[in-house]
Amino acid sequence: MVSFKRLSVTWDEHSLFIRGERIMFYSAEFHPWRLPVPGLWLDVFQKIKALGYNGVSFYVNWALLEGSPGHFSAEGVFAYEPFFDAASKAGIYLFARPGPYINAEVSGGGYPRWLQRNTGTLRTNESAYMDATDNYIAHIGKLIAAASVTNGGPVVLLQAENEYVPLVNNEASIIGLFTPGKPGGPDIYGHDGYPFGFDCADPESNWTPGRLPIDWGQLHLEISPSTPYSIPEFQGGAIDSWGGSGLEGCAVLANHEFERIFYKNNFGFGVKLFNIYMVSATY
């Protein structure tokens, strides 16, 4: 039996427990560095809460915090304490995703430019690369730990690395490469889902047979039965790339009908950690 007095966040095969209370973690993705106005963060969190979410997932952008090797600075609009405080005031739990690689559709995936001169192979255990991440990980890890629910803060989950297979997804489908017990496996297994892709030029073409998953719940039970069903990223919109067709088509692609059908479909599979990437106009 796990002692909830000792651990603030635990889980079983059904859901997370936060301070002993069973919850469904339903979160929206929001990145403070994309809206670098700390005075607006509480308003954003309150609106997210009003939409029915109880959590927010966020990336940390290493490139903005360590512009030169060994010089870490998370101050001013890049300070995270106001972000954590605003989440606490709004009653929002946080899911921290500090990378060091984040992708996030940013230049270099959030890597600082000076890392290109590193002699080690990036995203491996080569010492030159690992040593280059030490200063960032030590500082951001300390900030996140201080804001953990165990220390009275809002952070309840942390994702190590991001989109490791290979560059643009956390398992794009339920394969089971990273499940508890396997080398490098996390505590809780999860996969991503972008069933409609990003063809904003022809959004209606996505409504075809085969787009709606029918077996995700069963697949989860087969490959990670001891953890709650988790989707750390599920489609909440689409990307309009440079020279694309325009955001109007993207709004049609992932509209209210998509949300009603696909989100409820995931609820039917028993998802208990469900993160929408991204929310509203915060991207």
Protein language model regions, located:
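Gly/Pro-rich turn-and-neighbor structural signature
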Residues: 152-223
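Aromatic-lined substrate-binding rim segments of carbohydrate-active enzymes
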Residues: 40-109, 178-181
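Aromatic-lined carbohydrate-recognition surfaces of secreted/lumenal glycan-active proteins
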Residues: 97-100, 149-165, 172, 179-180, ...
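Catalytic-core region of carbohydrate-active enzymes that cleave or remodel glycosidic bonds
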Residues: 85-88, 92, 178-180, 201-283
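Short, well-ordered coil/turn segments that N-cap beta-strands
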Residues: 24, 52-54, 88-94, 149-156, ...
